[in-house]
Design a protein with these regions (language model features):
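Extended Lys/Arg-rich, glycine-bearing segments that form polyanion-binding/interaction patches
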Residues: 23-149
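Short, contiguous acidic and Ser/Thr-rich linear segments
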Residues: 188-191
Length: 206
């Protein structure tokens, strides 16, 4: 039951170097997830080193520049005790694996057909702001239902009032109105590293 994870990608740059975007922020986010799930915090420097070692060991599997493909890196941690009771595990494993993946948007970037979900993804003061496996397991029914009905993704609104957009099942939401960038402020959505970077850049350049 105690499982948290991160996800990032290794890219081949135009000059041939292999790069990975801000793994230090993934390390910090996993530390927060571990604390919330009563798991021992994996040291952030060791997290980054494990990611770098995994990329180096799989360098031959990093797709070439211009292909749109990447090497997906998945660090994850989980309890391994053989216990029945509802309590934190005594032993844990931290692992990292990598696999080549194609472009996230197959066929290029295109508009998505989305729906406002009737179900809630996370509750106030719950676990929506950490990258816990349970959050994604709970959304499987809803995303399968959306696909069966012709939608690409679900838009989740706040569980308390159901009046404010929060995020999709797989990403944060950002709106651009003129020269203004607008993104939901909520304690029940995952703090996206991509969103953080876009907000930072917008403050400098917009």
């Amino acid at each position: 039951a105690q499982t948290c994870f991160e996800g990032m990608k290794a890219y081949t740059a135009e000059d041939g170097r292999i790069v990975c975007f801000r793994p230090d922020l993934n390390a910090a986010r996993m530390a927060k997830s571990c604390e919330r799930l009563k798991m021992p915090v994996y040291p952030e420097d060791k997290f980054v080193d494990a990611v770098v070692q995994t990329i180096r060991a799989n360098e031959a599997w990093v797709p070439p520049y211009g292909s749109g493909a990447t090497l997906y890196i998945r660090p994850y941690m989980f309890g391994i005790d053989a216990v029945i009771g509802v309590k934190p595990a005594n032993e844990y494993q931290f692992r990292v694996f990598g696999t080549p993946v194609g472009p996230y948007f197959k066929g290029g970037v295109r508009p998505l057909t989305v729906r406002i979900s009737d179900l809630d993804r996370a509750a106030p003061r719950g676990t929506g702001d950490v990258k816990a496996g349970l959050n994604y397991a709970m959304s499987l029914y809803n995303i399968v239902d959306a696909h069966e009905k012709g939608f690409d993704e679900n838009i989740y609104v706040d569980a308390a009032t159901r009046t404010h957009i929060e995020e999709t099942g797989g990403a944060n939401v950002i709106f651009v109105k003129g020269n203004t960038l607008v993104t939901p402020k909520s304690d029940s959505i995952l703090p996206s590293i991509t969103r953080r970077s876009l907000v930072y850049l917008s403050l400098i350049h917009i």
